[in-house]
Structures are given as C-alpha cells and as structure tokens.
C-alpha cells in the first residue's frame, strides 16, 4: 500500500517515455547534469510531458500512506490543468537565442523549498505554490523592479517559469539595455525583430557587437520599432550597409552613440543620411570603414555639431580636408582617433588643436607625415590632453615632447612606441612635467638608457602613479633600470622587457630578494631571452645568441 501511489506514477512515466518516441526523463536529467543547453526546437516538445512527472514530489510515512492512492480523479485533474497551462504558455512563447534556454529541470522545476519530514505523506505542489505566494505578496510593480536587475540570460529563464512570469520578464521596461555579444553566434534576424517588437519605445541601449548574421531588414524593423534608442553598437556586423543608416536616420532621431567599427559596406551615403536624421550624435566609431572619404565626414560634421568623439582608425582615404571640417563644425570634440590615416599632415593637427581645445584623447599613430609641429600645437592649445598615442611617428623628437610635458600636465597615458628619435631627454621632461603619468610605452625607442629610466623613477609621477612601463626592444636598458624602478615606484604593476638584450635572468630573479620588493607583491615582469646556440665553427671563442625567444 505504501508504494502503490508511486507505482501508478511510474506507470504514467513509462507511458510518457514511449509516447511519440520522445526523449526519456533519464536522458533529460543527463542533459542537465552535463550542462547541455537546449534550444527552443529541442526543448518545447518535451516540457509538456516532463511536468507530469516533476511537478509532484512524494515523501512517505507509515501513518499516512493512504494519501498516496486516494482521490485519483483529483490527481488526474491536477495533471490535466498543469498540461493545459503549459500548453497555453508555450503557444505564446517568444523565440529567443538558444543560449538563453535551460534544461527543463532547471528552468521550470524548483525543489529548493521541499522539506523532508519524518512523518506525513503529502502530495506537494512544489513550484506553483511558491510562485503563487510570490505573486500574491509582491505587487506587479515590485516584481518588475526586481526583474529589472537581471541580465539577459536570467530574464529569459524567468520567462520560462509561468505565463504570469513570462509577461513580467518580457515586459519592455526590463529590456532598456541589451548586450547580445555573448549570444552572437545564435542571434539572427528573427531574434532582433522579436526583441524590437517586444521592447518598443523602452529600448535605449543595444549592443549587437559581433552578430554577423544580422542584416539590413532586421535593422529596419529595429529602427521602426525602437524610436527612442540612444546607443547602438553594430561593431563587426559585416552585413550592415547604408540601408541600415538610412532607417536609423528616418526613425531614430534620439540616437547619440553609434558604433560601426569594421562594417566594410558603409560608405559616404550612410554618413549623409545620419547627418540629416541623427543630429544629436555625440559619439561615432567608423574604424576600418575603408570606403569612407572626406565627403562623408564633411556631411557628418555639418549635420552633427554636437560630436564629441570621432574614431576613424584605418580610414586611409581621409585627408586634411576631413579633419579641418570636423574642427570647424564640431568645436566640442574631445576624442579623435586617426590611426593609420596616413594622409594627415601638421596642418590638419594645427587646425584641430586651435578649434577643439577640449581634446583629451588624441591618437595619431602611424601618421607618418607628422612632425614636432603637431606636438607643439597640441601643447599650446590642448591643456586637457590626458591620453596621447603616437606609435611610429618617426619624425617626433625630444623638442616636441618637451613642449608637451611643459603644458599638458594632465597626461596619464602615453604610447611612444617606435618614436625612434627620442632620447633620455624626453623622459627627463616627462618626469618633471607629468605628475599623473600612469602608463608609458617606450618600446623600440632604441636610444633610451638606464639614466633616462633612473630620472623617470625619481619623479613624483613614478613614485605615486606609474603602473605600467613598456620597454620592449630597448637594447641599452640593463638590470640597473630594474633596480631603479623597483626601489622608487610604489604602484608599479607591470614591466614589459621583451627583447631587451642586456636584461639578464639573474636580474629578474634578483627582484624576488630585493628588500624593497615587498611593497610590490603583485608586480608582473614580462621578458624572454634568446637561447644560446652552438658556435658556427669549432674554433669560435664566443657564445652566440639568436633572436629566437624563449618565454620566461
């Protein structure tokens, strides 16, 4: 008698297992324990039957075993109600990325409130009792507020709990900020269209970075459904073209931040459309949109005078004309990236510096035509400059950096890699004039010596703020520089010493035993050393070193 109720339940489960050849309950549990993700197509056919088995939990006692086998009719009614409820729920189910779905036993079944008792046989509604209590005691507004703190995955899981929670979890107010980068392989057009309709006017920020399956049709639906969007990241959405920008221009007049990094089909026409309909743009990233020319940038600058950040890394067709238009029409510009815009000259940097005094981030790396005149203009007109990247500006000398250090005292990060003409004099000027300096790259600056590092180490910036120093391929740097840095720099976190031929293994090892090293317990020193090779002839008297690198 004790096990008669369980026997009938097991019979029912066996019927379920063979019905239409569906996957067995045991297989479902195995999927859960192995961490498999279930897509909508895999998941929905099974959950209707799965709840027959799992929405009930039995525990037994000799004194009340009769509760197992009485009221069979009521038991059947409960099962039928459960099935009907979930059938209706999944008819209304939204399509979501498969990464958002969980195995049924996790997404739908909660056993956490089951308390084992030494007496009493009960048939317990485990999850639905909990849900009913939550819905009864917490008003809808409070539940919405709680759900608003969840990420995308958690919201999708909550949407699978019940019909009531589906409505709450998918309420547009919970989807104001969405980042689908983690699901980029699963996100296709129907997902974006569904999100667009669901969120509507609530959506403010959306990141589709890396979602390469997204095309113009989906983005047109998004633009039409979400007119209040303010920030949109389409980086690496390679199917996006000018059509998307035309839709944004027509429907999304509140757009302020747009990232089109590595969207190769974007042309000048896209910028002209944006300048007409998205005049509130403040930040735009056009990096590696290699079809852009001066015409598109001029149209954008004229139509979007509030621009504060313009990133055009790798836009090799841009010339001085584009930069002068930005300077003329966007005086509030604060950040500009001209990496590999090789046609830019000192004349463009001069006008940019004069007209945009609020600049705090400037990248002119690989602009090989620039000279010290550009640094002098930045020093004279941009006192708020805090980040300067000028990799491979091979015409820059100590004189330019001396002027910069004298007037730009807020500098925090400088990348001077491959500025091959600078010497220790630059370090002396930076040490005296830039007390906030946190990160400095001097890689491939082959004229830097231990004396320059010593002067830098003795400066206030090194003592209090310097955290990262990169000295890759500085052939005149020796172990003495390590001693200077370790003794004086109290916040140093990382030193790069790759291919510094005069740095020795013993110098690196000595760091562990220096008395003052205890104040830098987390410092990382990155270096590698060339292995010794056999001499080319038997009579050779010196060991030879190759440039091949062995990681330390």
Model-derived features: where do they sit?
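C-terminal capping region of solenoid repeat domains
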Residues: 2-50, 78, 82-83, 92-109, ...
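N-terminal adaptor-interaction module of cullin-RING ubiquitin ligase components
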Residues: 2-60, 64-69, 78, 82-223, ...
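Short amphipathic alpha-helical molecular recognition features
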Residues: 130-142, 150-157, 170, 183-187, ...
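Leucine-rich repeat
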Residues: 131, 140-143, 160-166, 187-196, ...
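Short amphipathic alpha-helical interaction elements and helix-loop-helix interfaces
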Residues: 144, 148-153, 171-175, 184, ...
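Inter-repeat linker/turn residues at the boundaries of leucine-rich repeats
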Residues: 163, 173, 201, 224-227, ...
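Conserved hydrophobic beta-strand positions in leucine-rich repeat
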Residues: 178-181, 204-208, 232-234, 258-260, ...
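Internal metal/ion-chelating core segments
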Residues: 283-294, 298-320, 324-328, 334, ...
